[in-house]
Curated annotation (Swiss-Prot):
Region Interaction with 5' end of substrate DNA, residue ranges: 120-124, 226-231, 264-266
Biased composition, class Polar residues, residue ranges: 94-109
Disease the record associates with this protein: Spinocerebellar ataxia, autosomal recessive, 23: A form of spinocerebellar ataxia, a clinically and genetically heterogeneous group of cerebellar disorders due to degeneration of the cerebellum with variable involvement of the brainstem and spinal cord. SCAR23 patients manifest epilepsy, intellectual disability, and gait ataxia.
Family listed: Belongs to the CCR4/nocturin family.
Glycyl lysine isopeptide (Lys-Gly) (interchain with G-Cter in SUMO2) crosslink location in chain: K23, K82
Protein name stated in the entry: Tyrosyl-DNA phosphodiesterase 2
Changes after translation: Ubiquitinated by TRAF6.
Length: 362
């Protein structure tokens, strides 16, 4: 979760920060909740009451005032929402979203096309969470991709998915705080193995989630991550990118390797890392840098964060390494998801999702 060109003055300052204050506070909430083993809403209350100073807030939580009146003011842990999202049959709330054409349905059925969605679903934003979760899940049900890569999943969101998406197998990078997830359509994608690679110096609970699968006789290695956030953590983010690329290089030559996730990358950071290896491509660049799906974090178009500065960045990216015997799987198209506001007046996430279709050469 989570500027580029921004407007002058305050807008330029917003880009230098790389992420608004509200986002930093959500990360503090996650850290607090992890330490205190409490709900994120409880963490937010204690941090806000203590001027967002972690140590003061934790002391307040673990050593509350003994007066009865003070105890009564302590917020109760908020239980998991009782309404669950049905991934399998819910109508999309985006009336303008074009549906999959019959030819694409046929291509999926006969195995000549492979589809994926990657989306930072902004689970740390608790406002309108149930409505936004329904919005995200309606897109997943509409497009029914073979693989779904999600970032910023939180336990209640995971429960939505786990309880109502029986047609998908879900692998997560963690089970507490916030984490990534990979969802595999059981009818097409056969899981062979999975692994989690820790980022040893992360300050934000980040890691690399990998699964090895088989699709229509093709061996694939699928990866997702949520790289370190904010401008101030660029060095750590670049180290994490290097780990991702190294892992992609180490995958068996017989496998097609796909990484999809929220990289938080600025183009200059990729350049500073030496660029991508010769055998790994950025799918957006491979497809000719289409303008319609360039920016996945766009505060001019997306009002969820309430930022006045017009900031556009391509945080969410897909990296692709073909198998040694090239030509079996080829990226074909890329589109944005989640561009319409929901009935609650907000978008499903502060990020747009990415829908990628790939051709399988039979």
């Amino acid at each position: 979760m989570e500027l580029g060109s921004c407007l002058e003055g305050g807008r330029e300052a917003a880009e230098e920060e790389g992420e608004p204050e509200v986002k930093k506070r959500r990360l503090l909430c996650v850290e607090f909740a992890s330490v205190a083993s409490c709900d994120a809403a409880v963490a937010q209350c204690f941090l806000a009451e203590n001027d967002w100073e972690m140590e003061r807030a934790l002391n307040s939580y673990f050593e509350p005032p003994v007066e009865e009146s003070a105890l009564e003011r302590r917020p109760e842990t908020i239980s998991e929402p009782k309404t669950y999202v049905d991934l399998t049959n819910e109508e999309t709330t985006d009336s303008t979203t074009s549906k999959i054409s019959p030819s694409e349905d046929t291509q999926q059925e006969n195995g000549s096309m492979f589809s994926l969605i990657t989306w930072n679903i902004d689970g740390l934003d608790l406002n309108n969470l149930s409505e936004r979760a329904r919005g995200v899940c309606s897109y997943l049900a509409l497009y029914s991709p073979d693989v779904i890569f999600l970032q910023e999943v939180i336990p209640p969101y995971y429960s939505y998915l786990k309880k109502r998406s029986s047609n998908y197998e879900i692998i997560t990078g963690h089970e507490e705080g916030y984490f990534t997830a990979i969802m595999l359509k059981k009818s097409r994608v056969k899981l062979k193995s999975q692994e989690i690679i820790p980022f040893p110096s992360t300050k934000m609970m980040r890691n690399l989630l990998c699964v090895h699968v088989n699709v229509s006789g093709n061996e694939l290695c699928l990866m997702t991550s949520h790289l370190e956030s904010t401008r101030g953590h660029a060095a750590e983010r670049m180290n994490q990118l290097k780990m991702v690329l190294k892992k992609m290089q180490e995958a068996p030559e017989s496998a097609t390797v796909i990484f999809a996730g929220d990289t938080n990358l600025r183009d200059r950071e990729v350049t500073r890392c030496g660029g991508l290896p010769n055998n790994i491509v950025d799918v957006w660049e491979f497809l000719g840098k289409p303008k319609h799906c360039q920016y996945t974090w766009d505060t001019q178009m997306n009002s969820n964060l309430g930022i006045t500065a017009a900031c556009k960045l391509r945080f969410d990216r897909i990296f692709f390494r073909a198998a040694a015997e090239e030509g079996h799987i080829i990226p074909r198209s890329l589109d944005l998801l989640g561009l319409e506001k929901l009935d609650c007046g907000r978008f499903p996430s502060d990020h747009w999702g990415l829908l990628c279709n790939l051709d399988i050469i039979l």
